[in-house]
């Protein structure tokens, strides 16, 4: 059985554009720009954009990740200003998206335009132990390219 997360809609305009999973296999829900008017984001500029949606996950085993929409990034250079947004389970309030225009042209963001996607993910919190060394593994301390190419 899948958990259901209660998401509050703050902007009545979303009534006709509720976030929805596009397919049964979709991981993310699209978030929209809940702005009153068109917003122009200049090259190199970052703007905070309201989504009109409030969330309180309440379960410490869950978090929400805000991710860019691939088409906006590839076609227009519009990505998230913080690259990935993280919504902790104890946050209560409206979600905002930090939108960064890394492109060369001004970008006109229209009201209710899809700007990002949200994925709910499980969270496992780490505990830390002071040690003198690790148990040996085949890989060892190799990193950054140590397993080769191809």
UniProtKB/Swiss-Prot annotation:
Q: Could you tell me which InterPro entries the record lists for this protein?
A: dUTPase (IPR008181), dUTPase-like (IPR029054), dUTPase-like_sf (IPR036157), dUTPase_trimeric (IPR033704)
Mind listing the UniProt keywords for this protein, alphabetically? Hydrolase, Magnesium, Metal-binding, Nucleotide metabolism
- Quickly give the catalysed reaction: dUTP + H2O = dUMP + diphosphate + H(+)
Which stretches are annotated as coiled coil?
Answer: none
Q: In which pathway does it act?
A: Pyrimidine metabolism; dUMP biosynthesis; dUMP from dCTP (dUTP route): step 2/2
Give residues annotated as binding substrate: 69-71, 82, 86-88
Question: Which biological process terms from the Gene Ontology are attached to this UniProt entry?
Answer: dUMP biosynthetic process; dUTP catabolic process
Q: What are its E.C. numbers?
A: 3.6.1.23
> Its biological function?
This enzyme is involved in nucleotide metabolism: it produces dUMP, the immediate precursor of thymidine nucleotides and it decreases the intracellular concentration of dUTP so that uracil cannot be incorporated into DNA.
- The name of this protein is Deoxyuridine 5'-triphosphate nucleotidohydrolase
Which species? Answer: Chromobacterium violaceum (strain ATCC 12472 / DSM 30191 / JCM 1249 / CCUG 213 / NBRC 12614 / NCIMB 9131 / NCTC 9757 / MK)
Gene name of the encoded protein = dut
């Amino acid at each position: 059985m899948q958990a259901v997360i209660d998401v509050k809609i703050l902007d009545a305009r979303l009534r006709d554009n509720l976030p929805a999973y596009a397919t049964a296999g979709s991981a993310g829900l699209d978030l929209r720009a809940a702005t009153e008017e068109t917003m122009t984001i200049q090259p190199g500029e970052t703007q905070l954009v309201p989504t009109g949606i409030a969330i309180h996950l309440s379960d410490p085993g869950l978090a929400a990740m805000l991710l860019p929409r691939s088409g906006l990034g590839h076609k227009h250079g519009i990505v998230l200003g913080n690259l990935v947004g993280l919504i902790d389970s104890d946050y209560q309030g409206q979600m905002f998206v930090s939108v960064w225009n890394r492109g060369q042209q001004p970008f006109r963001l229209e009201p209710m335009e899809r700007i990002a996607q949200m994925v709910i993910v499980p969270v496992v919190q780490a505990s830390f132990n002071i040690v003198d060394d690790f148990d040996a593994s085949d890989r060892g301390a190799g990193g950054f390219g140590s397993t080769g190419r191809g």
